[in-house]
Regions:
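A structural motif at transmembrane helix-loop-helix junctions in multipass membrane proteins
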Residues: 133-170
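Short hydrophobic, aromatic-rich alpha-helical segments embedded in or entering the lipid bilayer
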Residues: 1-6, 174-205
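Membrane-interface helix termini and inter-helical loops of multi-pass transporters
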Residues: 37-48, 120, 189, 193-198
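Alpha-helical transmembrane segments of multi-pass membrane transporters/translocases
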Residues: 21, 65-66, 130, 189-231
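Hydrophobic alpha-helical transmembrane segments of multi-pass membrane transport/permease proteins
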Residues: 11-39, 53-69, 158-170, 207-215
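Cytoplasmic membrane-interface segments at the C-terminal ends of transmembrane helices
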Residues: 5-12, 36, 69-91, 120, ...
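Hydrophobic alpha-helical transmembrane segments of multi-pass membrane transport proteins
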Residues: 34, 48-86, 90-118
Length: 231
């Protein structure tokens, strides 16, 4: 059994983890879509009801994945240091942790997409599924970077939540003019288009793929650098 599989099984053995990964996205989608629609009108956005449900699925997977990435990296400092000193090496430790976290965040994204599909139906299901997974992996990267650099649990979790809230209310559909620096800007655009029955442009797909890859590579690099310093 490789280390990534071992790390994943370690988390999945805890029943509460699976409950969070599945129940939170479902609850968020069924309760928050209307709230997002109302906030959009207040902020000058133009988020339709079905698009709001799609965006809620993305944000549900993003919130869980950001939290997962943060606590997976911040709580494993001691164990990762021992693994590095035992000869595993910081690069392989980082690879295993990131892959395990990607598996868990994908489970959360799948639960969010399934809840979205059951609640509203999706005009472009594959587009929505890819965008929800992109949300999850983007915020997994955010959580891992913060968890690798910030040791305090309170400070780190507040940073992740602050980034999340800022991104929610400044992104496409929510604000009259989406902020160009919004982390999930392209993922939100794809989800809104899928929920509204529109086709996503090839340029948006390329941007979404590139942004997601950059987030994961950055998470890997920062985690490996942090593990190397600890060893």
């Amino acid at each position: 059994m490789n280390r990534a599989t071992a790390f994943t099984r370690e988390q999945l053995r805890m029943p509460f983890t699976m409950i969070l990964l599945v129940a939170v996205p479902v609850a968020f989608i069924f309760s928050a879509a209307g709230v997002l629609h109302d906030f959009s009108k207040v902020l000058g956005g133009s988020l339709a009801a079905d698009a709001a449900s799609g965006l809620a699925a993305g944000w549900a997977s993003a919130f869980l994945s950001g939290s997962l990435g943060y606590f997976a990296s911040s709580s494993s400092h001691g164990a990762d240091r021992r693994l590095s000193l035992a000869g595993v090496g910081p690069t392989r430790v980082a690879h295993s942790r990131i892959v395990a976290s990607m598996v868990l965040s994908t489970i959360a994204a799948f639960a969010a997409f399934l809840a979205l599909w059951l609640r509203t139906g999706v005009a472009h299901p594959w587009h929505s599924a890819v965008a929800v997974i992109a949300f999850a992996w983007l915020y997994l990267g955010v959580g891992v970077v913060v968890g690798s650099l910030v040791s305090g649990a309170l400070e780190g979790s507040l940073i992740v939540v602050f980034v999340f809230i800022l991104d929610v209310f400044s992104g496409p559909g929510m604000a009259a003019a989406p902020a160009p620096w919004a982390i999930s800007r392209t993922a939100s655009t794809v989800l809104i288009a899928a929920g509204s029955g529109r086709v996503t442009s090839p340029a948006d797909w390329v941007t979404l793929g590139a942004t997601t890859v950059v987030a994961l590579v950055m998470a890997f690099a920062v985690f490996a650098f942090s593990a190397r310093r600890r060893s």
